[in-house]
A protein has these predicted regions:
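C-terminal transmembrane helical hairpin of 12-TM major facilitator-type secondary transporters
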Residues: 272-316
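A late C-terminal transmembrane helix in Major Facilitator Superfamily
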Residues: 324-364
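Cytoplasmic helix-loop-helix junction between adjacent transmembrane helices
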Residues: 116-155
Length: 406
């Protein structure tokens, strides 16, 4: 029996590791703050819901653009500099559109919005690949690296709840206009944290291919990649809807419960059980959405959904690490990140397309977010849940047991 239980090394929690973990949290939070602000402003400007979905989904494609160059860049140049410049690119992309419209009164067209999201995704992808796949691994001993990957991924996972929470708080205290500069400041905080960590100098490699799958994509993990994308599309459907502050608080609580459950409930459980239980919890959340009771929709549904996604995410991350061959740990981390973000962004983009009347333009700027409904994609979400469960139980899990290397 293979279990989830991971030993805890207290000497891993040194100052540099803390800095990089919080840099990961702040960087991803800056991106998820746009979950509310992008549809808000596009609805206010009269864009169609389909266009909103395209702009959001463009980010999920953008994260692949610079991945093939990651290995060359971190081996040819100082790896922390690559990460810092990438984070700076994210910060600039977050604030440039706000600056153009606010101070120069330049209205940006739909094509420009798509291009900016592609660029934003490209910088974010390179930043995460160099941070999670290289820098965090470099700060710990070899026997601590699985634990370091596991912990740092949880910091990024919590940003799914923290980003919209912070965005709503900024919206309530100031206005939605302030969200973009606040998100940019968070990215700059991540940049400062990475800059405070000292990395030993490594001589640049000369014979490195300009483009490669190293530190980018793990080909032998493709079945797992597809399974993760399908599951994250389900979460993306839900996150494409406007929600109250309470919903995101409960989503955060659900993620925290998943973290606790991994430590105490699944510590000695059979390997397959974690993903299956997670998918059952997601299905339960989908059935709760049929309820007309506000308590169930605002409290129980997001908690169940986050609990399911949280425990699935950690297990699939460890699957990816165990599929990696020698010197492929960074590649496995990047592949997991790509699958996670691609599925989420595609789900959000498709969610806007499936639900046509959620975001409506209003004469009152502060009331542009209206009419939360989610029955429209209950059937596709439940269908994807069933497909993901069957895929995992009959294809992915047997395949993983046959091909794992650790």
């Amino acid at each position: 029996m293979d279990t989830q239980n991971t030993p805890v090394h207290f000497n891993l929690w040194h100052r540099d590791f803390w800095r990089l973990c919080f840099a990961n949290l702040f960087l991803m939070t800056s991106i998820y703050m746009l979950l509310l602000s992008i549809p808000y402003f596009m609805a206010k400007e009269g864009y169609s819901v389909t266009q909103v979905g395209v702009v959001y989904a463009a980010y999920g494609l953008g994260i692949f653009l610079l991945g093939g160059f990651c290995s060359y860049l971190v081996q040819r140049y100082r790896r922390n500099r690559v990460c810092q410049i990438s984070i700076l690119g994210v910060a600039v992309s977050l604030v440039v559109l706000y600056y153009l419209e606010t101070f120069w009164n330049i209205k940006v067209g739909f094509e420009m919005l798509v291009a900016m999201r592609l660029i934003q995704g490209a910088f974010l992808g390179l930043a995460e690949m160099s941070l999670a796949s290289t820098l965090i691994i470099d700060t710990c001993e070899s026997f601590q690296r699985t634990e370091a990957n596991y912990i740092s991924s949880w910091f990024a996972r919590f940003s799914i709840a923290v980003g919209p929470l912070l965005s709503l708080l900024v919206y309530n205290v100031f206005s939605m206009n302030v969200v973009f500069p606040v998100a940019s400041v968070l990215a700059l905080v991540a940049l400062v944290l990475v800059s405070r960590v000292k990395f030993p100098f490594k001589a640049p490699s000369e014979n490195v291919s300009l483009i490669s799958s190293d530190r980018f994509f793990l080909p032998q993990g493709f079945p797992l990649f597809i399974n993760i994308v399908c599951i994250m599309v389900i979460l993306g459907f839900y996150l494409s809807l406007p929600h109250s502050l309470t919903v995101y608080v409960m989503f955060f609580c659900g993620l925290f419960l998943a973290l606790v459950a991994e430590k105490y409930v699944f510590a000695d459980a059979e390997l397959k059980s974690q993903v299956i239980v997670g998918l059952i919890l997601i299905a339960a959340a989908e059935f709760v959405s049929l309820s007309d009771q506000g308590f169930a929709e605002e409290m129980l549904l997001p908690a169940l959904l986050a609990l399911g996604v949280g425990i699935i995410g950690s297990r699939f991350l460890l699957f990816y690490i165990k599929l990696a061959k020698h010197c492929q740990r960074g590649t496995s981390m990047s592949s997991f990140f790509l699958a996670w973000e691609l599925g989420l962004s595609l789900g959000i983009g498709l969610g806007f397309w499936l639900v046509k009347d959620v975001y409506q333009k209003s004469p009152d700027v502060d009331m542009a977010i209206l009419n939360p409904v989610h029955e429209e994609f209950l059937y596709p979400a439940f269908g994807l849940t069933v497909v993901s469960l069957l895929m995992y139980n009959f294809l992915v899990h047997p395949w993983y047991m046959k091909h794992r290397n650790r």
